[in-house]
Swiss-Prot record:
Organism: Avian infectious bronchitis virus (strain D1466)
Family designation: Belongs to the gammacoronavirus nucleocapsid protein family.
Protein name listed in UniProt: Nucleoprotein
Its biological purpose: Packages the positive strand viral genome RNA into a helical ribonucleocapsid (RNP) and plays a fundamental role during virion assembly through its interactions with the viral genome and membrane protein M. Plays an important role in enhancing the efficiency of subgenomic viral RNA transcription as well as viral replication.
Domain CoV N NTD stretches: 31-156
Principal place of residence: virion
Key words of the record: ADP-ribosylation, Disulfide bond, Host Golgi apparatus, Phosphoprotein, Ribonucleoprotein, RNA-binding, Transcription, Transcription regulation, Viral nucleoprotein, Virion
Length: 409
């Protein structure tokens, strides 16, 4: 069956917005770029790179038999007086059967091509890894566990454990013949905080500190693209992007605090752990199409189940209680509370009257018994009891380690 390319506008998803980091170089047409960052020659007219090890970048997602490909030279220029000026070449890695030299078999001699393979790789096979679309995916950091290129080349260091939407700014550094191993990069992942909301807020803050900031024009584009593809930029309220919060119909998630703070509210990032991905929504939902006068309406019904055994079950229930049909309300810990009295000032029943407590229905005590209990309290116990009546409830919720997966945010 013959197939042809469609022309004109498509209904493809909007490009992913990258919050920080260097803009990936585009090699050839869109969607034909290397998955990895470039090797950069230190001088003009440097010879092709030679590697201490196999020369294949580390990629744990591939089997050993698929670890082969080629490095391709890319001439670079920069504008100068009287025209463009040559700068040292860049070399990009592609798997065999992909990229600009996709039609070449492994080992075919050609100027500007260096073939590499890991020990045990099947160089007769062709990769199905494809190439990268720079508008949707960032470059993957280069790592060589068995030895990198010779001293004529360098590459920008990018942390290997960065999140996709939180790229750190690449700091240019001279590359030694052996780069940090993957085990070392795993070790840097172990310092996670226990509080899920605090972790979520920290991720957002780090994204804003590292790399380039979102421009006003980019933020406006994020907030006003097609409704189903919108995301809330930093500094925007929820209702600026998705309209006013409602009750008992679409748009009913979010209380007043969440609406005002937008993505700064850690509960947003926490609940995103339960929101289906695009693929899960499409293939795991009950999809109901309906033709209306204004167009085709698609309804997606999806259920996420949080087990009662989940350590974060109570926390998710609490957020839902606060935010579902939450318009016009605020969390209790966000409301102003009476200030605690300092411990240095002794509090007594006469100087610091405590609010009257409701008597328990199950235990009925006579007034005489109550008087005897009061007399039995020491002065320190009286002071502590009075103080506790005015203490604020703790605002920090211990979410635990298991609430947040390594790649969920």
């Amino acid at each position: 069956m013959a197939s042809g390319k469609t022309t004109g506008k498509t209904d493809a998803p909007a490009p992913v917005i990258k919050l920080g980091g260097p803009k990936p170089p585009k090699v050839g047409s869109s969607g034909n770029a290397s998955w990895f960052q470039a090797l950069k020659a230190k001088k003009l007219n440097s010879p092709p790179p030679k590697f201490e090890g196999s020369g294949v970048p580390d990629n744990e997602n591939l089997k050993l038999s698929q670890q082969h490909g080629y490095w391709r030279r890319q001439a670079r220029y920069k504008p100068g007086k009287g025209g463009r000026k040559s700068v040292p070449d860049a070399w990009y890695f592609y798997y065999t059967g992909t990229g600009p030299a996709a039609d070449l078999n492994w080992g075919y001699s050609q100027d500007g091509i260096v073939w590499v393979s890991a020990k045990g790789a099947d160089t007769k096979s062709r990769s199905n890894q494809g190439t990268r679309d720079p508008d949707k995916f960032d470059q993957y950091p280069l790592r060589f566990s068995d030895g990198g290129p010779d001293g004529n080349f360098r590459w920008d260091f990018i942390p290997i454990n960065r999140g996709r939407s939180g790229r750190s700014t690449a700091a240019s550094s001279a590359a030694s013949s052996r780069a940090p191993s993957r085990d070392g990069s795993r070790g840097r992942r172990s310092g996670a905080e226990d509080d899920l909301i605090a972790r979520a807020a920290k991720i957002i803050q780090d994204q804003q500190k590292k790399g380039s900031r979102i421009t006003k024009a980019k933020a406006d584009e994020m907030a006003h693209r097609r409704y189903c593809k919108r995301t809330i930029p930093p500094g925007y309220k929820v209702d600026q992007v998705f309209g006013p919060r409602t009750k008992c119909k679409e748009g009913n998630f979010g209380d007043d605090k969440m609406n005002e703070e937008g993505i700064k509210d850690g509960r947003v990032t926490a609940m995103l752990n339960l929101v289906p991905s695009s693929h899960a929504c499409l293939f795991g939902s009950r999809v109901t199409p309906k033709l209306q006068p204004d167009g085709l309406h698609l309804r997606f019904e999806f259920t996420t189940v949080v087990s009662r055994d989940d350590p974060q079950f109570d926390n998710y229930v609490k957020i839902c209680d606060q935010c579902v049909d939450g318009v016009g309300t605020r969390p209790k810990d966000d409301e102003p509370r009476p200030k605690s009295r300092p411990n240095s000032r002794p509090a007594t029943r006469t100087s610091s009257p405590a609010p009257r407590q409701q008597p328990q229905k199950k235990e009925k005590k006579s007034k005489k018994q109550d008087d005897e209990v009061d007399k039995a309290l020491t002065s320190d116990e009286e002071r502590n009891n009075a103080q506790l009546e005015f203490d604020d409830e703790p605002k920090v919720i211990n979410w635990g380690e298991s609430a947040l997966g390594e790649n969920e945010l």
